[in-house]
Swiss-Prot record:
Protein purpose: Catalyzes the NADPH-dependent reduction of L-glutamate 5-phosphate into L-glutamate 5-semialdehyde and phosphate. The product spontaneously undergoes cyclization to form 1-pyrroline-5-carboxylate.
Biological process (GO), any one: L-proline biosynthetic process
Gene Ontology CC entries for this record: cytoplasm
Gene Ontology terms for molecular function: glutamate-5-semialdehyde dehydrogenase activity; NADP binding
Keyword match rRNA-binding: no
HAMAP family: ProA
Pathway(s) where this gene product acts: Amino-acid biosynthesis; L-proline biosynthesis; L-glutamate 5-semialdehyde from L-glutamate: step 2/2
Protein name per Swiss-Prot or TrEMBL: Gamma-glutamyl phosphate reductase
PANTHER family according to UniProt: DELTA-1-PYRROLINE-5-CARBOXYLATE SYNTHASE, GLUTAMATE SEMIALDEHYDE DEHYDROGENASE
Organism name: Burkholderia ambifaria (strain ATCC BAA-244 / DSM 16087 / CCUG 44356 / LMG 19182 / AMMD)
Catalysed reactions, as listed in the record: L-glutamate 5-semialdehyde + phosphate + NADP(+) = L-glutamyl 5-phosphate + NADPH + H(+)
Keywords in alphabetical order: Amino-acid biosynthesis, Cytoplasm, NADP, Oxidoreductase, Proline biosynthesis
Amino acid sequence: MDIDQYMTDLGRRARHASRAMARASTAAKNAALDAVARAIERDAQALKDANARDVARAREKGLDAAFIDRLTLSDNALKTMVEGLRQVASLADPIGEIGNLKYRPSGIQVGQMRVPLGVIGIIYESRPNVTIDAAALCLKSGNATILRGGSEALESNAALAKLIGEGLEAAGLPQDAVQVVATADRAAVGKLITMTDYVDVIVPRGGKSLIERLINEARVPMIKHLDGICHVYVDDRADLAKALTVCDNAKTHRYGTCNTMETLLVASGIAATLLPPLGKLYRDKQVELRVDAAARAVLAEAGVGPLVDATDEDWHTEYLAPVLAIKVVDGLDAAIEHINHYGSHHTDAIVTEDHDRAMRFLREVDSASVMVNASTRFADGFEFGLGAEIGISNDKLHARGPVGLEGLTSLKYVVLGHGEGRQ
């Protein structure tokens, strides 16, 4: 296969389809989503058979249990896909909305209209459910998309792509609006991320090594985040019960997510009260604690252990594991300075009953999501009321934070006049 020609052809077809998608009616887009949902229900066994072949090959390669779990399309996974498609269909269609419409002294009206981005390239790893999630959001937001899934899920993704194409055709929409790259050749990724004539934005969903490669090689703009080094700062005016709940949930609800707390900052004035019960809670849940000298002194006196001395590298690390770095700080200023220096601009939280300190934290912490008295685990499109998300961005331009339908659109100015000319 000539990868360069193959990818160029996908791009050309996607660009053509994007024009039809931009003018597609809400009814047609919703009909396509419903048709795909019904096709998944109808062909569930065929999907599971294709997926079983992918899973068997993954096991032959010796891939670990966690990877196999992400790859597997269980009955519950298929049900979740169907529910997700219908949920996206139920969301308000942002395309064509005109906001901020106002008259100018010249007599013209000026507003902003929400429009699709165009063609979105999505690169992801082992989860075949992303094929459906990404296709649904791109379809509803009026975009065409090129999906490049993981090589281990080729048969699963091909089977899902067939059903998506059927759904688009049934609704009178171009099948080329959703295309799945049908090769495991890594050169396909290299071509996709440089096709500036055909692709408007790349959304990567994967591990750090993938994102780093794309940052270095991509010429197409990206919506991305590299790390999720999330912090909780417990202020000396915090409510102890709230602090225990937030700190427990932020770390132990799930260890492998990008919105999990990786560093706990504790004000020196509350350390002796908070750390002993919190340390015992983490110990009971087998969380390894990497601590500075001040935190060690408090925890050791309370009989909490074992403890590991933190190094500077710990403040930079996204563990994605039952490991937590703990540092005692002088107060709010030191906490904000630490977060802005070591953090990844993803999600950070303060626990405090002091309104002024809470507002300072919200203003001064330079992150995509900043929270007061709430777990960092809430940084999620569904929890934020977006309905669904295609990913999370910690960049400052275009989309920031969880990216839902509106994040896959942009605004253009529209002017309504009555024959006016500029004086």
